[in-house]
Structures are given as structure tokens and as C-alpha cells.
Amino acid sequence: MINLIKIGTRSSKLALYQANLVRENLKKKFPNIDYSIVEIKTKGDKIQDRNLDRSIDKGFFVKEIQDSLIEEKIDIAVHSLKDLPVENSSIIKTSAILERGNHKDVFLSRSKKKLSEFTKNEIIGTSSLRRKAQLLNINPNLTVKDIRGNVDTRIKKMINGEYDGLVMAAAGIERLGLEGYISEYLDVEIMLNAPGQGAIAIEINSDKSEIDKIICKIN
């Protein structure tokens, strides 16, 4: 019988929000089980001084959490689905995906301007090559620069004047209650989101059938 489930997650505000959302969903179904949050630093959290698209490799934001799962330091791993590698593993598996949040990207700006109102003298920050390519497709004269850090860190950089605008995932902004910074939601016709964006995935060890029976109930 399972009495405690250890939930592994990154340590950012957004990651902790998502891990706690998983915990609350599990509590509703299994109130007699105890749950603990285990914070784990990933390579993506540690490397903050390089362009993300040049630094990224398989499992950039999840490998250390998956390693802790395989080593049974945690019982389940909570990820943003878009961060998971495409390749399947025989050792671990996705047991559940929570109801998907907003899949769109949003544009944030200090001046509350919309993207169409931006000029080449104003700097837009993004860590994503996908977003940069689409921004320049919308307007080749836009100035787009790399930005790193968690959601709140990026917004602080914008407020402090390092950037005039940002393109980010709507789900993360909404989950942290930061909608007040949104200038507009970007339709997928002009800014196609990442696969799985807005969804939260829960991984387990493939041979843990008892855990699987619990976690799949919140799928």
C-alpha cells in the first residue's frame, strides 16, 4: 500500500505551481496518501548565460528529474509536456497528462503596445528560435534578442527596461496570475505554438504498476 508519493519538479515558481496542481488533483482522488514536493535543478536551470537554442540538447529541462525518478529518489516527475524529449523510453513512461491549459503564445509589452505597433527601435525578447523566426516573418524590421530566466525574471527584465516586449507561453503567464502584463494573445495563424504547449505531463517508472493505477486516475 502506498502511503507517500514524492513529486519531483524544477524549482521555478511556475514548475512548483504545476507540481502543486498535480498534488491537489491527486489529493482529491486519494486523500489518505501523503504527498511531498522534491525540487530538482536541471541543466536548463543552471545554464543562464548562453543562447537556449544553441545550448539545448535532449532533456535539457528534464534529464535530472528523470534520473531521480529512475534512481527512485522520487515517485513521479512533473514536467511541462513541451519540454519532454520526443523519443520514448522503456524505463519511464508518461502515466497522465492534466487537462491542457491555454496553448497560445502571448505578447507582453511595457507600453501596452500590440506587436503590430512595435518599431525596429524597440527590443523584443524571446529564448525560442521558433518564436524569433515567426516574429521576423511578421515584420523583418523587428529587433529580436535572446532572453533567459524564469517567467518572473523575464518580466522583471522588461519592467527594468532591458526589453520593450516579450513573447511567452500564455499558460505560464495565466498560471502565475500575471495576465496584467499581456498586451495581446497571438493567434496560431501568426505565431504557431510549440507541440504540447500548455499541458502538464506526469512520468513514472514503467515497472511501478501500483503508482500507475493512482496517477492514471487524474489523466
Where are these regions (language model features)?
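Domain-level signature for soluble enzymes in the chorismate/prephenate branch of the shikimate pathway
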Residues: 1-219
